[in-house]
Curated annotation (Swiss-Prot):
GO MF annotation terms: UDP-N-acetylglucosamine transmembrane transporter activity; UDP-xylose transmembrane transporter activity
Membrane topology term: Multi-pass membrane protein
Family: Belongs to the nucleotide-sugar transporter family. SLC35B subfamily.
Job description of the protein: Sugar transporter that specifically mediates the transport of UDP-N-acetylglucosamine (UDP-GlcNAc) from cytosol into Golgi.
Descriptive protein name: UDP-N-acetylglucosamine transporter slc35b4
Keyword Heme set for record: no
TM stretches of this protein: 6-26, 37-57, 77-97, 104-124, 136-156, 173-193, 209-229, 252-274, 282-302, 306-326
Subcellular location(s) per record: Golgi apparatus membrane
Keywords: Golgi apparatus, Membrane, Sugar transport, Transmembrane, Transmembrane helix, Transport
Highest classification ranks of the organism: Eukaryota, Amoebozoa, Evosea, Eumycetozoa, Dictyostelia
Entry superkingdom: Eukaryota
Entries under InterPro entries matching the protein: SCL35B1-4/HUT1 (IPR013657)
Length: 351
């Protein structure tokens, strides 16, 4: 059996339905207004922080009937670590969504975001002294080639654009590419920081990390206050959509945005639950299948351009990622313990 148990079908369903619906709703928003990236990011962060807040509350039973909140769960990870993670997380999230404002096609956007293996290996080998097997190096080469093929297939035809007087399209695409590259490396750095943090404080800290990383990011959106207010007005002015079951009508962009933020939370929770209940191989396989389905839906439903070169790049990225997940453990050369590690180990011995 590929799946470890029938219980894993629940998070798999959450990933397939939640993540695919999230991509569809995002593309529906971007089709109507390409400049909605910041508003979408803000509502995603606010929604996840709000829902996660209730997961992090400590409850006390009263009279064997009622439960009352008595405060937040004890936070194990220090604030300075969260500040570092939040800063990186906020910047990469904004970069990923803002890249969609720069003529980056949704299928290419999904493929590129699936290729973080490249930056993870580069950063891991340079800063964390990790060594990789031949199969892992081969996986890296495949992913790199996949990125190159996908990039060339998605680039605007410069000769055609110049002849039409649309030179900015190629420039915008290049800016979007730089945003995605920066976000890819930041994502890998964040992943390695989280991996190190979970080693120190326990792997069961994900509910805490989700809450604080989104909550502490919200003040940063004050930098984009005018942009957010402008797009809230655009949402209010969008065409009305008839709601099912006789609930009247509601502005279309608000409907898409609500669906987007709710499905993103379902998607995130599905990934976390699946990671805890199945093997890394199963998790990687499910996520890769989900991303491939999202690309197919984007191409068919939204009539996005999908060349043979882009298809080849897609296969190389997913196959390379799958090979890497089956290649065994990465060998880490021991680093000298930091002051923080020494303090934690000393505390464990005393307890």
């Amino acid at each position: 059996m590929i799946f470890d148990s029938l219980i894993s079908l629940i998070p798999i369903s959450m990933i397939m339905v939640g993540c695919c619906s999230n991509v569809i709703s995002l593309e529906l928003i971007m089709k109507q207004s390409q400049s909605h990236a910041i508003l979408v990011t803000f509502f995603q962060f606010a929604t996840v922080a709000f829902i996660s807040f209730f997961v992090n509350i400590r409850w006390k039973q009263v009279f064997s009937i009622f439960w009352i909140p008595i405060g937040l769960r004890e936070r194990k990870i220090p604030l300075k670590t969260y500040f570092l993670m939040v800063s990186i997380f906020f910047i990469l999230s904004v970069l990923n969504n803002k890249a969609l404002d720069c003529d980056i096609p949704i299928p290419f956007h999904m493929i590129f975001r699936s290729s973080s293996l490249l930056s993870t290996i580069v950063i891991g080998s340079i800063f964390y002294r990790k060594s990789y097997s031949k199969q892992q190096i081969l996986s890296l080469i495949m992913v790199t080639l996949g990125i190159i093929f996908a990039t060339f297939s998605s680039m605007p035809d410069s000769k055609k654009e110049i002849s039409l007087g649309h030179e900015p399209n190629l420039l915008r695409f290049s800016i979007g590419m730089l945003m995605l590259i920066a976000a890819m490396f930041l994502s890998s750095i964040l992943g390695l920081i989280q991996e190190h943090t979970y080693k120190l404080y326990g792997k069961d800290r994900h509910y805490e990390t989700i809450f604080y990383s989104h909550l502490f990011s919200l003040p940063f959106f004050l930098l984009f206050k005018d942009d957010i207010l402008h797009h809230i007005q655009l949402n209010n002015d969008s065409a009305l959509m008839a709601l099912p079951f006789g609930f009247g009508s509601f502005p279309t962009l608000w409907v898409y945005l609500i669906v987007n933020v709710l499905t993103q939370y379902v998607c995130i929770q599905g990934v976390f639950i699946l990671t805890g209940k199945t093997s890394t191989l199963t998790c990687t396989l499910v996520i890769s299948i989900r991303k491939f389905l999202s690309i197919i839906i984007s191409v068919i439903y939204f009539n996005n351009h999908f060349t043979s070169l882009l298809f080849t790049g897609t296969i190389l990225v997913f196959l390379g990622t799958f090979m890497y997940s089956t290649s065994g453990k990465v060998i880490e050369k021991p680093l000298p313990p930091t002051k923080q590690v020494k303090e934690i180990e000393k505390e464990k011995k005393l307890n």
